[in-house]
Regions:
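Intrinsic-disorder/low-complexity, polar/charged segments enriched in Ser/Thr/Lys/Arg/Asp/Glu/Gln
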Residues: 12-20, 88, 100-102, 113-117
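Hydrophobic ligand-binding cavity/cleft-lining segments
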Residues: 1-70, 77
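Hydrophobic-ligand binding "helix-grip"
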Residues: 69-112, 136, 149
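Structured surface interface patches that mediate subunit assembly and partner/cofactor docking
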Residues: 6-11, 45-51, 55, 90, ...
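Beta-strand/loop substructures that line and gate deep hydrophobic ligand-binding cavities in soluble
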Residues: 98-144, 155
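Well-ordered alpha/beta subsegment
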Residues: 149-152, 156-157
Length: 161
């Protein structure tokens, strides 16, 4: 069982991506904690589109270039739900009335290197919230998937450097 399973055992929306990294778990964990938005290919472009080109205060949709992206997230709307070095990090946020999200990075040692997964889960408390979020998810999920895959690649570059 993962900490994500403990934090969000039920959900209606889910996205999962993985990558193999030739590094030890602690090095990968440190890379996850250190990656900045400018290291994630297309991050700034896709979040600019998501926010409609508006300038917003610093946050996950408007991350600066100097801080690790997880620090930006947890200093604004996200909170750490679990931090289990060097195995798993889970952060979560309240998106809107009746809608909560959690995401993790899970490091699983393998024969050579590690498998690193990131998963997002969203729970909507009632049918109205589910319908509202389903439309939003339909629109943002492709960009979200691109960001997650690029985020994993940025972690890999850092960990294998």
């Amino acid at each position: 069982m993962t900490h994500l399973d403990e934090a969000m055992p039920r959900w209606q929306f889910r996205e999962r991506h993985e990558i193999h990294i030739n590094a030890d778990p602690q090095r990968i964990y440190d890379a996850i904690r250190a990656v900045r938005a400018d290291e994630i290919t297309l991050f700034r472009t896709l979040t600019w589109i998501r926010r409609g080109g508006r300038n917003l205060p610093e946050g996950i949709l408007n991350a600066g270039k100097t801080k690790p992206i997880l620090d930006v997230a947890t200093e604004t709307t996200f909170r750490y739900l679990a931090d289990d070095p060097p195995r798993e990090i889970v952060v979560g946020t309240h998106i809107a009335r009746g809608i909560d999200a959690a995401m993790n990075f899970l490091i699983t040692p393998e024969a050579s290197g590690c498998r690193v997964t990131t998963e997002t889960r969203v729970f909507a408390a009632d049918a109205k919230a589910r319908r509202r979020f389903a439309l939003y998810w339909f629109v943002i999920r492709p960009g979200s998937g691109i960001i997650r895959r690029m985020w994993l690649r940025a972690v890999k570059r850092r960990a294998q450097a």
